[in-house]
Amino acid sequence: LSNPPLCRTGPFKPHLAPFLLPQDPSEALREGKAAGIPLIAGANAEEVAFPSLQALLGPGDWEEAERRLLESGLSREKAQALLAHYRKGVPDPKRAWGEVQTDLTLLCPSLKAARLQAPHAPTYAYLFTFRAPGWEGLGAFHGLELAPLFGNLLERPFLPLFLRQEAQEEAEYLGKKMRRYWTSFAKDGEPKGWPRWPLYREGHLLRLDVPLGLLPDLYEERCGALEVLGLL
């Protein structure tokens, strides 16, 4: 929670190697090396934010947030520019810190992949925003989408989140919708269901929640500044 660029500087990232991964994936997508291969890309709204934990572990003020970014390896200029971008829309530094982490680690890299692939193949993007009723403080955290998608609501580690009937019913409803999209995509290369899942180039993402819906593309709002700063 204290090191947002961790996935870019630590071992848990793609490593270029001539025998296995000879080219940066972003460059390969941009050049059309995966042309003709349909893609679904997306992320969860609070991948690594955990709103209730940010209240305890997030930075107490913007100065502390800047210090954390400096400790993670960002230059002062980039750290200040990054925080200025988030400060415009999120006045609370704790909440902003959660968004910074989510955007840097998963949301923006996923949407960037969709943007790069969209000219070359049918590409679809989503944002998973479902929060388990009664556990809203955990947010739509990393991996939560697996419970409704595979229907393993009463298996560990998800069991405590779905003991309530309301939580089970909502997750089961969402899971049926998700499986319809995912299986038709695997079969036909197009995620079929209702609402219609538009192509990413049409400017919308599918919002996976109860109820389902569409969202305008978040890239420019959430990720444009990160790309300008060279953080994507």
Q: Language-model segments: what does each one mean?
A:
Residues 90-93, 158-162, 200-205, 209, ...:
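A short alpha-helix capping/helix-coil boundary motif
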Residues 131, 153, 211-213, 231:
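Generic structural motif
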